[in-house]
Amino acid sequence: MRLSVLFSTYESPRWLEKTLWGLHEQTHDDFEIVVADDGSGETTAAVIERLRDEFAARGVTVRHLWQPDEGFRKCRILNRAIVEATSKYLVFTDGDCVCRADFLAVHAARAERGHYLSGSYYKLSMAASRAIAREHVRTQACFDPRWLRANGMGEGVRRSKLVR
């Protein structure tokens, strides 16, 4: 099943990069990424451009939709992303979320015409968020309770919705 992954970003290249790392590790291969940029500068564009070739090698298209920074207009650029998406199934996330490798596979497996599939997020501490490196996403270590506790998340993470 072909999916379009849409998310917004604004002047957060560090978190955008981590979001793209998570999407790069997806076990489901039939998707495109549409980044809805609400007026970020050149650093954001550079992150997208740097990773675009890696996605292309997997057959995944990454499109960067940009609008000038004229204040908070996130909804406008997301609406444009919806219009420009090429699949009939849209998956929304955020530009600071790191998706588990099975995120899109679960969406594809559970998709049902006429229904919405809703998920949630788990807010990490700033220490844990900063500690996430590409290798942690590649190996999925950043979703392991031991890694999370070692990086400032505390004991409650074992019972969280983040881990299986």
Question: What does each model-found stretch correspond to?
Answer:
Residues 90:
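Short aromatic/hydrophobic "clamp" motif used to bind/position activated sugar donors
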Residues 2-4, 32:
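Cell-envelope/extracellular polymer assembly enzymes that use nucleotide-activated donors
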Residues 68-85, 102:
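Glycine-rich, basic loop-to-helix element that forms the pyrophosphate-binding segment
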Residues 102-140, 148:
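Conserved donor NDP-sugar-binding/catalytic core segment of glycosyltransferases
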Residues 22, 37-48, 97:
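A conserved acidic beta->alpha catalytic loop
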Residues 30-42, 63-67:
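Short beta-strand/loop segment that forms part of the nucleotide-sugar
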Residues 21-30:
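Short, acidic, metal-binding catalytic loop of nucleotide-sugar glycosyltransferases
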Residues 20-21, 45, 87, 101-112:
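Short alpha-helix within the catalytic core of nucleotide-sugar-dependent glycosyltransferases
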